[in-house]
């Protein structure tokens, strides 16, 4: 996606399109219009057509889009044939939920290992994922693991991020309230569930439908 030089907003929507197109293919549907895509993914048709236009002629006017072609295109664009191996740091309630869920049911992302400091959890498996002590982080992380999920207390998030910066990790999904400072070669996505909930409540009160 980076080589295409497409807008980041478009890049964020590609997995959403891919998931819906997967479902269409499984249902046996052969083609789909931008209006149908719009209704399913809740993105307006003009935005979908603009997103798709960055990749050339993916469809035909009056015909729509060939589902199998779109599926093949997005699988290649999103590197769906390559497994992205992930480490999870912090096996509390949220971290444990991630381990039980994992991601291979829906895409090409797989949590390979987890880290914590709890004696009750270290040395066990949760959801089939081994849990190691945080002291073993640098030793256990292989070059194959390039993404980390942070579900640790906010007070230790920065120190863990600093340690991850010394490994081959290039992406961090941060579920802590802490805003992390890392080198430019590491990309961070912040997901603060409390902020998201507060934002939703604000919109409900101030922008009623």
Curated annotation (Swiss-Prot):
Q: Summarize which parts of the chain are annotated to bind DNA, as ranges.
A: 16-55
GO biological process, any: response to redox state
Main location per the UniProt record = cytoplasm
Record flagged with keyword DNA-binding: yes
Q: Name one GO molecular function term.
A: DNA-binding transcription factor activity
Gene Ontology cellular component list: cytoplasm
**Where does the protein end up?**
Cytoplasm
- Entry keyword set: Cytoplasm, DNA-binding, NAD, Repressor, Transcription, Transcription regulation
Binding sites annotated in the UniProt record for NAD(+):
90-95
Q: Which domain of life, per UniProt?
A: Bacteria
Protein's job: Modulates transcription in response to changes in cellular NADH/NAD(+) redox state.
- Describe the protein's quaternary organization and the partners it interacts with: Homodimer.
Q: Which HAMAP family match?
A: Rex
Fetch the NCBIfam families from UniProt: PRK05472.1-3, PRK05472.1-5, PRK05472.2-3, PRK05472.2-4, PRK05472.2-5
Q: Give the family, as the similarity comment puts it.
A: Belongs to the transcriptional regulatory Rex family.
Mind telling me what this protein is named? Redox-sensing transcriptional repressor Rex
- Organism, as annotated: Bacillus cereus (strain AH187)
């Amino acid at each position: 996606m980076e080589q295409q030089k497409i807008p980041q907003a478009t890049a964020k929507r590609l997995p959403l399109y891919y998931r819906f197109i997967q479902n269409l293919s499984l249902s046996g549907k052969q083609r789909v219009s931008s209006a149908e895509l719009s209704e399913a993914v809740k993105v307006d048709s003009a935005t979908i057509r603009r997103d798709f236009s960055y990749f050339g002629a993916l469809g035909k006017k009056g015909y729509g889009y060939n589902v199998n072609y779109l599926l093949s295109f997005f699988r290649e664009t999103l590197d769906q044939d390559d497994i992205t191996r992930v480490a999870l740091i912090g096996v509390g309630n949220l971290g444990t939920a991630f381990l039980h869920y994992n991601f291979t049911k829906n895409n090409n992302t797989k949590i390979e290992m987890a880290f914590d400091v709890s004696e009750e959890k270290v040395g066990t498996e949760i959801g089939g994922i081994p849990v190691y002590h945080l002291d073993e982080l640098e030793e256990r992380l292989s070059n194959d693991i390039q993404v980390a999920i942070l579900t640790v207390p906010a007070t230790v998030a920065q120190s863990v991020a600093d340690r991850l910066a010394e490994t081959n990790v290039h992406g961090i999904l941060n579920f802590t309230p802490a805003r992390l400072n890392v080198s430019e070669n590491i990309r961070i996505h912040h997901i603060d569930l409390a902020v998201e909930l507060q934002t939703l409540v604000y919109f409900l009160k101030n922008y009623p439908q």
